[in-house]
Amino acid sequence: MHRWSRLFVPTLREAPSDAEVASHKFLLRSGYIRQLGAGIYSYLLFGQRSINKIVGIVREEMDKIGQEFLLPAIHPADLWRESGRWTVMGDNMFRLKDRKGAELCLGMTHEEVMTDIARNELRSYKQLPQIWYQIQNKFRDEPRPRSGLLRVRQFLMKDSYSFDLNQAGLDKSYDLHDAAYRAIFTRCGLNFVVVEADSGAMGGSGSQEFMVYTDAGEDLIASCAKCGYAANMEKATSKLAPVEELAATGDGQPELISTPGQAAIADICKFLGMQPHSDIKCVAYMAEVPSEDGKTSTWEPVAAFLRGDHFVNETKLLAVVGATELRPMQAEELEKWMHGPAGYLGPVGLTPAKKLRDGSLNVVLDLGLEGRRNLVAGANKLDYHYRNVTPGRDFTWTVAADIRNAAEGEGCPVCGEPLKVAKAVEIGHIFKLGTKYTESMGARVLDENGKEVMPVMGCYGIGIERILTASIEQNNDANGFWLPRSIAPFDVVVTITNMADETLRQAGEALAAQLEAAGYDVLLDDREERAGVKFKDADLVGIPYRFNVGKKTLEGKTELVTRATASSQDVALDAAVEALKALTA
């Protein structure tokens, strides 16, 4: 058993002013963590005990399907150049040089390192499949660290990598991870949902995220209550309801009209008496496109066109264009590529690239504009718009694709029922990478026929601290939070209300010893503090059960409190262990 009087648990009555989300506030107030710098945290006793329990669960489930490794946190730049990601990762990667000038980085992820082991050690199909995992610190140069442990610069991850002979083998490894993740998050007591996701810089095809709904989340999830469809907003699609088209004016051809001072969509809609869905919105970007070898990159112009009531999904647009970063066009770039000022941009008269990334203007049309007619668009001229604009007749594009955010109330892409959109935090992610890394890094094995083939890869990640954070977000009230027994720093706290009373002290000591003998992880609150202080601390720090050893103990009873429900029951001292077993069975 642990004695609170001997522990360092620096609880706070008030959260620091810069703590915004509930989990951040309570992690600080409960003494789980302390901040060292922006996005950099120290884990104190209670925090580390919870992290250790989470790691234990993850390790138990991963050992059922894979083998644990531990890889370096410092990587040579050349390894990342081989995969092409030295450029792709941009400013998110911590980069450094050693005293000899060799370029290095702090690992954000370990696909390259694992693939390097595979290409040097795997020779035959007989050595496949392989699943290798590690639990290791990762580093990311977050531009705006925030929300406590949700957006940090150093974080603990379980990352695993599978190597299979073919796609069928990858599917099996992927399914093994899916089952393992469900077991892990269930054992950690989380209410989670599995959603379709974008692969991003990881590459590959299939991708799913494991998400926990919370207002502190930075992701948006679109879901359907009827059929179960769920997807991250970066991936979500929807069915659009038909909209009424504007009547054509004049001869029905594009008509240049004066619209002085009507740069905003809301203004032009009011000025012309129309709805935003009849406007063509233009969002102009410069996109950073990496070279094939990943060593260099160029900036290419992109004009995205979509309905005036829709919003660009930049993740989708990046994927369509094959870029790593987007930034808005500056005034001189607008003049060069769009031949007009912001607020009056439109597609009529533009010369789109014949194919993506050929150095000319990449015009991307959202699918929501296909088949529309008699729309209003900027004329690429200050204070002027066109009306009667019909896509395909009056302008062309380089590529048409889904580049918009799905919105609440739009139709589910599977069954058509209205979608719901809610915030969530990602706790795990699984990817089917394919041969992206084995091809670029030259990993080969001989198949059954003696032919060289590239192993097919998957990668799979779990954010360890995010499990703790998500649990606190799901389980808190005004007084603090409670954790599931499986990941709480202690299973139960025995609170002696008056240490000056020898009878109570002995009863508390005896009860704590009995609970420990029964297999519980016990904290004995033997501090020389008022009972009220002890109760407040116990409510704050996440321990799921509490025995109060107080006045009723003189009658042979103790009060058993369940933190999650704030319910209590009086039980006989000699039946206390059995009472707790009944609650934790």
Swiss-Prot record:
This is Proline--tRNA ligase. It comes from Acidobacterium capsulatum (strain ATCC 51196 / DSM 11244 / BCRC 80197 / JCM 7670 / NBRC 15755 / NCIMB 13165 / 161). Its EC number is 6.1.1.15. Keywords: Aminoacyl-tRNA synthetase, ATP-binding, Cytoplasm, Ligase, Nucleotide-binding, Protein biosynthesis. The keyword Membrane does not apply. Consists of three domains: the N-terminal catalytic domain, the editing domain and the C-terminal anticodon-binding domain. Homodimer. One of its GO terms (biological process) is prolyl-tRNA aminoacylation.
